[in-house]
């Protein structure tokens, strides 16, 4: 009986001999693990074990955890990050990282500034993240050149800073008009040097204008992108809400295609081989004469 007990104790000790990950040793564990396995973190000989299997549930701060890890691209999707509040610069300048982290529970995170800044390869689906606690998203995707994820459903209603959020995100081209920007105070250069199209920028501005619980005032808003259908609303933001929006004339200015937009109204049907009826309408609108399958978007005079 004693031999069996000793054997059980030995097996128990051997099975749990790895050093637990704590808030105090988290960064040390990363440094030790990646010193031997810088690409995948499969440091089985480390006192902390293989990185993907770490229990990080007690870690609250992941500030710059993988900053400037030029080779790292390890699988950490199974991490329990539900206690983390700070992810500032977590993958900043980690140019190779492009792993699935869609399973992460980020509902406690309040700061994601610089999180993927300079993470040039990252382009994973993070659309399901609960970011409702986040207040700072400034520079979040700064120079994240590959990122073009659909994050249109994010709840950003508590965010106050989006300064340079997509600056240099050359591939980013999404309509994020469903965002409630009511609490935002900073948007300087949010779309500077992005890939956002005229139509997606228009949809974004139109959506923000119509969806905000309260339209924020005195926003400094710049970005060298083009606009068309959102022209009236942009001028409203300038004249009624005090937004500082330079239009044409510098590398930080919006480029106006307004009012010469490639949008067809009911008055154009005589120039085109189509019929649009009835006008006005309260319910249904018919467009007759389109020979090919065509995507049609319909707006009222406010862009809704």
PLM features: what roles do these ranges have?
Residues 4-13:
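Sec-dependent N-terminal signal peptides
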Residues 16-19, 268:
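Bacterial Sec-dependent N-terminal signal peptides
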């Amino acid at each position: 009986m004693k031999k069996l007990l000793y054997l059980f104790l030995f097996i128990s000790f051997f099975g749990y001999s790895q050093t637990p990950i704590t808030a105090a040793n988290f960064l040390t564990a990363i440094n030790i693990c990646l010193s031997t396995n810088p690409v995948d973190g499969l440091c089985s000989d480390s006192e902390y074990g293989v990185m993907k299997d770490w229990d990080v549930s007690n870690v609250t701060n992941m500030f710059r955890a993988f900053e400037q890890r030029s080779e790292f691209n390890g699988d950490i999707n199974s991490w329990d990050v539900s206690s983390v509040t700070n992810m500032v610069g977590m993958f900043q300048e980690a140019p190779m990282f492009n792993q699935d982290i869609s399973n992460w529970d980020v509902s406690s995170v309040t700061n994601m500034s610089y999180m993927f800044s300079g993470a040039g390869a990252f382009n994973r689906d993070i659309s399901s993240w609960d970011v409702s606690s986040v207040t700072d998203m400034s520079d979040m995707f700064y120079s994240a050149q590959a990122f073009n994820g659909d994050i249109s459903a994010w709840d950003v209603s508590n965010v106050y800073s989006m300064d340079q959020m997509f600056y240099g995100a050359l591939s980013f081209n999404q309509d994020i008009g469903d965002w409630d920007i009511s609490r935002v105070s900073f948007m300087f250069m949010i779309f500077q040097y992005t890939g956002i199209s005229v139509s997606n920028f228009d949809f974004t501005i139109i959506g923000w204008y119509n969806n905000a619980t309260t339209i924020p005032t005195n926003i400094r808003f710049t970005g060298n992108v083009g606009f068309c259908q959102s022209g009236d609303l942009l001028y409203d933001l300038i004249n009624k809400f005090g937004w500082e929006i330079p239009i044409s004339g510098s590398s930080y200015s919006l480029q106006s295609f307004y009012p010469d937009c490639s949008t067809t109204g009911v008055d154009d049907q005589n120039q085109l081989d189509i019929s649009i009826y009835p006008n006005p309408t309260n319910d249904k609108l018919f467009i007759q004469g389109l020979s090919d399958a065509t995507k049609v978007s319909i707006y009222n005079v406010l862009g809704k």
